Amino acid sequence: MIGALYVVGPAGTGKSTFSGSLNEWLKHMEFDSAIINLDPGADYLPYEPDFDIREYISLDSIMSDYNLGPNGSQIVAADMIVSYADKITEFLEDLDDYYVIVDTPGQIELFTFRTSSTEIVEKVSGQRSMMAYIADAPLSTYPSGFIAQKMLYASVFSRFFRPMMFVLNKIDLVSDEDIQEVKKWESSPDLLNDAFMEEKGQMEKDYFIGILEAFKESNIMTKIYPVSSKDSFGFEDIYSQMALYFTGGEDNDTYREEG
C-alpha cells in the first residue's frame, strides 16, 4: 500500500459517494486503487467495497446478543472494528502499489470520537495515513455553518494528528460566487468575522472572535479543496495532495520504479 486516505465527516456530507467516486476516478486515471468500507451499519453503499467490515460485524447480531437498540449496537460495532484490524492488514498485504480509500462510519462520532479509532489507523496504515474531512458545501455558505465545520475539522485533527484536507463536497449544489466567498473567508478570518456578524449580529461576537483568533494561531485556517462527487471536479487536487504526502509528489508509476 502506498497510503490510506481516511474519509471522515458528519452524516449527510456525502462521504461514501465521495469515497466511491474518488476510487473510480483513480482507476480511470490508471492508478491502482482499492476501497474499504468501515461502516458496519451501512444499509447501502454507492460502490462495491474491496474489503467490507459488514462481512465480520452484523448490527442485527449485536442487537440480539447484547440486547441493544440501534444506537447502542452502532457504538459496540464501532468499537469491535479494531478486533478485525489484522483482517484489514492481511487484505492490504498484496496491494503494494495501491492507494487505499477508507470510508468511515456515517456518524462522525462513531469513528472520530471512539478510543479504538486511533488504534485502527495505527494498526492498519500507521504513518502512511492521511485524512479527508468532508464538509457540506451548502452549509458552508453560511458563516456560522462554515465555522462549525472548521471546529469539527479541528477536532478530527486533534484526535489523529495526521495530514488533513478540508474537502468542500457537493459544490454542484452551490454557485461559483458562493465558493469564492467561502475561499475568501478561509484566507481572511477578518472577512469571516464580518460575514458572521452580519448573519448573527453582536450577541455571540466575543465568543466567535476568540474562536477565529484560535483558528489563526493554530493554522486551522487551511486550504479548501472544493469537489463534486457527481462529476469528479477537484479530484485531481485531492490526488495531488495524496501523492505529495505519500510519494513526495511523484506519480504512482515513478514511485514504483524508485520505491
Task: Mark where each language-model region is.
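Nucleotide-state-sensitive switch-loop elements of NTP-binding domains
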Residues: 2-8, 13, 17-119, 126-130
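Conserved beta-strand segments of the P-loop GTPase G domain that flank and frequently precede/overlap
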Residues: 7-8, 37, 101-104, 131-138, ...
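Eukaryotic short linear interaction motifs
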Residues: 14, 42-44, 140-142, 173-175, ...
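Conserved GTPase G-domain signal focused on the G5
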Residues: 14, 228-246
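Conserved catalytic-core segment of NTP-binding enzymes
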Residues: 109-209, 215
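Structural and coupling elements of P-loop NTPases
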Residues: 162-165, 225, 232, 254
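Beta-strand-loop-alpha "switch" segments that mediate conformational coupling across diverse proteins
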Residues: 216-228
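C-terminal helical "lid" subdomain and adjoining coupling/linker elements of P-loop NTPases
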Residues: 248-257
